[in-house]
């Protein structure tokens, strides 16, 4: 850091570099090793922010030698977006609120402090306990007042989804009796009691019946596209079973079952063939298909001020592989089926909590509510947050309710580490990178927002 200050001083010595070098050189005596390290990181960030704000960026964005992003040294060089007032305020607040006692920092992150007298150590432990309990109380209050959905609201939303599912099932059996489908079923966070803030979304899984000898699935990593977590569904044995042998041959594009064509087939049924106003009047709901591009979505008003979105999700099962017609973010991969991991992730999370009466699901709900209420964190999905909790469960055994605050902070730090690397491996299938569909700009924004909240995590609960 001193070297960085010297190089900058040669270019534009305005006195700030000298002051910062003096502060850093004496910080260790006042704050200890841990405090000096954190103060150094934050001070360097402010100094570089100031330097870059007064000189237009000219060089391309740089990564660290390890190839990882770092929000201790923000990745703004070459960005077309100039530093705004919110960024400066965020970094200034982080610097001002840093603890002045090195014992407040994680001793696993920095060099261990010198041994302290027992009385002093007891006071520090008591202080840390009070701080932890304060955050614990705020997390529980946030969950009760902001994240938790009243049981009555959940029940009414589920009942509306069940009623509509029954009507759609009856219609398909009557109008399209030759369409090979298994029974439709409801899925999603509302069904699994993991939805937060409002009961406003649920999925209706529509399983297709495929002949096992006519279809096979090819992992995305084995194709020229090299995309783990996605599959091609290939039509097999056309020489023995010509086109038309399977009902779903009509949805084959280039020798592969196209999820987009399957979705278009259901769109004609959902949006074009069913008289939803009449069904809505019968059920005392207001039902209408969502406008494009959300073609396979129904918008339901089941009470005066309560709305529910129902997504129709075609699904195929080949052997042990379950795929859903949820498209890749990039249109060029619209012929790929997505591997369905959410049911297994949810089942593992629930099993872990049931085994030790843990707080994993509670921690997940709080994180989901924060992301849902914070626009800057809107790109984080429930699956990504679930996998952060599952990875943390492999590292930490104690998930008792009184450890909620500690585990919450660890989850934030872990999430920042995954964003720095640009990789979040699936806990169930490590080949799958759950950040693969995020752009570098989105990853930087998420990492910056979370990093600025580390020194004052309560800010996340005020959104």
From Swiss-Prot:
Region described as Important for interaction with DNM1L: spans on this chain: 160-169, 234-243
Residues the record lists as Phosphoserine modifications: 55, 59, 79, 94
Ligand binding (ADP): 187, 189, 201, 340, 342, 368
Pfam families according to UniProt: Mab-21_C (PF20266), MID51-like_C (PF21297)
Membrane-crossing segments per the record: 24-46
Keyword Disulfide bond in record: no
Keyword Membrane: yes
Lipid bilayer topology: Single-pass membrane protein
Residues covered by region (Disordered): 57-77
A GO CC term attached to the entry: mitochondrion
Role according to the record: Mitochondrial outer membrane protein which regulates mitochondrial fission/fusion dynamics. Promotes the recruitment and association of the fission mediator dynamin-related protein 1 (DNM1L) to the mitochondrial surface independently of the mitochondrial fission FIS1 and MFF proteins. Regulates DNM1L GTPase activity and DNM1L oligomerization. Binds ADP and can also bind GDP, although with lower affinity. Does not bind CDP, UDP, ATP, AMP or GTP. Inhibits DNM1L GTPase activity in the absence of bound ADP.
Subunit details: Homodimer. Interacts with DNM1L.
Family statement drawn from the similarity comment of this UniProt entry: Belongs to the MID49/MID51 family.
Name under which the protein is recorded: Mitochondrial dynamics protein MID51
Species: Rattus norvegicus (Rat)
Gene: Mief1
